[in-house]
Amino acid sequence: MKKFKLVSDFKPTGDQPKAIEMLTEGILKGEKFQTLLGVTGSGKTFTMAKVIENVQRPTLVLAHNKTLAAQLCSEFREFFPENAVEFFVSYYDYYQPEAYIPETDTYIEKDSSINEEIDKLRHSATSALFERRDVIIVASVSCIYSLGSPEDYLNLTISLRPGMTKDRDEVIRDLIRMQYERNDIDFRRGRFRVRGDVLEVFPASNTDRAIRIEFFGDEIERITEFDVVTGEVIGRRNHVAIFPASHYVTTAEKLKRAIKSIEEELEQRLKELRSMGKLVEAQRLEQRTRYDIEMLQEMGFCKGIENYSRHLTGRPPGSPPYTLLDYFPNDFIMFIDESHVTIPQVRAMYNGDKARKDTLVEYGFRLPSAYDNRPLTFEEFEEKLNQVIFVSATPGPYELKKSSRIVEQIIRPTGLVDPEIEVHPVQGQIDHLIGEIRKRVEKNQRVLVTTLTKKMAESLTEYLKDVGIRVRYMHSDIDTIERMQIIRDLRLGKFDVLVGINLLREGLDLPEVSLVAILDADKEGFLRSETSLIQTIGRAARNVDGKVIMYADRITNAMQKAIDETNRRRKIQIEYNQKHGIVPQTVRKGIRQIIEATVSVAEEEEKYEVVEKEIVENMTKEEIEEYIKELEQEMKKLAIELEFEKAAKVRDKIFELKKLL
């Protein structure tokens, strides 16, 4: 059996060896909750990777959004090139959930665009868990949403070997039960085709490789893997396991039982609605549900099948749904990254989902069993956990209360120390700020300024522009692509000061930033809480000249705690550096990578703008259609490489081109 093998030029330094040893010891001793309190830039991902290598267990890494999950997945793939590092996030590029607005009698049907690549990666993740133990899955919070039964998923998996007695038509029936679709012309993921005694299957978890099964009578003669594009044979296989094409598969017996159970629930609900005089709702529900039942009987599938997941899996009402967590073996470990954000997000998922379903059930769009197609409640989530390590620079009260050990990682490999903090009175703050900005600009350094309101941010930006400072304002309406471009321009020195309200979102750990100015630091609220302040202070921790200025007339409790905690860390870091003769260095590594990524985004944008203006106008309808196909290929390629921002940009260009047809 393959083992986790970490490949890296790094050696653990600073606090890392102690943190790795203590966290590993905690897991081996069976401790359920631990916290890695790691400051910005201390190499938390490397510590996580070393712990995984030490304990050799399947691992789930939970991140609070897709972008962060993609970053982590790329890092873990670099650390573990020989192991299965998988990616599991919501596969919707665009998702409008089903909803009903009673005030205007508006029913909004579920509308979504499923990203084929991400769907493939999800299948790759679940199938890896059944095939091996050296698996790391990096997931967003969408992994606590309902998924089909792992038992049915595994039971329907087909295992084939050369020499096996197996009728070709029997294998075809099995594939159809697993929701594979026969298509002899358009061969794609989740489909199969038949040519005489040769059956070719394109597994749901693959992008470019398919399986060819050759029969001789009732016996499998040969199994080969081939490249779908070139047709070239990659190699012969002694065994192949084909996993279902959907996570919502069920056995024939369970499907029969499910249909009977749906019919019984429908009859009961219709009685209730009619007794309340809700005849329109009753008629609507009957019409919609009967259509779904008919589809299930004929096809084994229907639109919105997830709303019947409780019936399909045979679970009692109100019981927790199956999720990705159920696909893991019992001894798995879990890292919850940026836990101070991720844990509250997990808590909020259930209530938001229930509120939307209330109106759908009340007005006859769905049966009450639709409530059971839902995310886990927080209590159910806790019950499914085995051993967890919370990872954050500012763990929340939940993590601190639950953890049997809190392991600090305060020393950075670069020797950088936390920034010094100065509190300045509000009177004359703008003139003082301008003076500080000019000092930084002379040294070719950058400045972040955080305000509390949009109005304040806009006014400040205008004022700074008027006095000759190169400044930009980043607000919440800016999309990811533009955001990356603004960050790129800041790093390249196209402007010197970035003003924003919430500068805590990912991607703003910039080595060039030597000053963070916090306006209205003494106003109580979530943007000026202890956690937010510490996270904001961390934005200046990647530069050797890092400094934070808080503009305030009084020192609030949150400010005092943030200042004390920063000074405590600073003292430890300075003492360590003096003891080991370390001279702090501004972070250099990674600048080029980030600039490359963002430059290419900008180049793509410029390329498409030029193409659109100069070429598209002169294209025929057929040429535009051909160009759209090329862009779709490029979009899929970018998604495979986890370059979701670039892929989204190409997708937007496709939408614009389709409007011209």
Swiss-Prot record:
Full protein name: UvrABC system protein B
Role of this protein: The UvrABC repair system catalyzes the recognition and processing of DNA lesions. A damage recognition complex composed of 2 UvrA and 2 UvrB subunits scans DNA for abnormalities. Upon binding of the UvrA(2)B(2) complex to a putative damaged site, the DNA wraps around one UvrB monomer. DNA wrap is dependent on ATP binding by UvrB and probably causes local melting of the DNA helix, facilitating insertion of UvrB beta-hairpin between the DNA strands. Then UvrB probes one DNA strand for the presence of a lesion.
Domain Helicase ATP-binding: 25-178
PROSITE patterns attached to this UniProt entry: HELICASE_ATP_BIND_1 (PS51192), HELICASE_CTER (PS51194), UVR (PS50151)
Domain UVR: 625-660
The organism's taxonomic lineage, starting at the top: Bacteria, Bacillati, Bacillota, Bacillota incertae sedis, Caldicellulosiruptorales
Domain Helicase C-terminal: 429-591
Keywords on record: ATP-binding, Cytoplasm, DNA damage, DNA excision, DNA repair, Excision nuclease, Helicase, Hydrolase, Nucleotide-binding, SOS response
SUPFAM superfamilies cross-referenced by the UniProt entry: C-terminal UvrC-binding domain of UvrB, P-loop containing nucleoside triphosphate hydrolases
GO molecular function: ATP binding; ATP hydrolysis activity; DNA binding; excinuclease ABC activity; helicase activity
Matching Gene3D superfamilies: 6.10.140.240, P-loop containing nucleotide triphosphate hydrolases, UVR domain
Family the entry assigns: Belongs to the UvrB family.
Annotated source species: Caldicellulosiruptor bescii (strain ATCC BAA-1888 / DSM 6725 / KCTC 15123 / Z-1320)
GO biological process terms, semicolon-separated: nucleotide-excision repair; SOS response
Chain positions of motif Beta-hairpin: 91-114
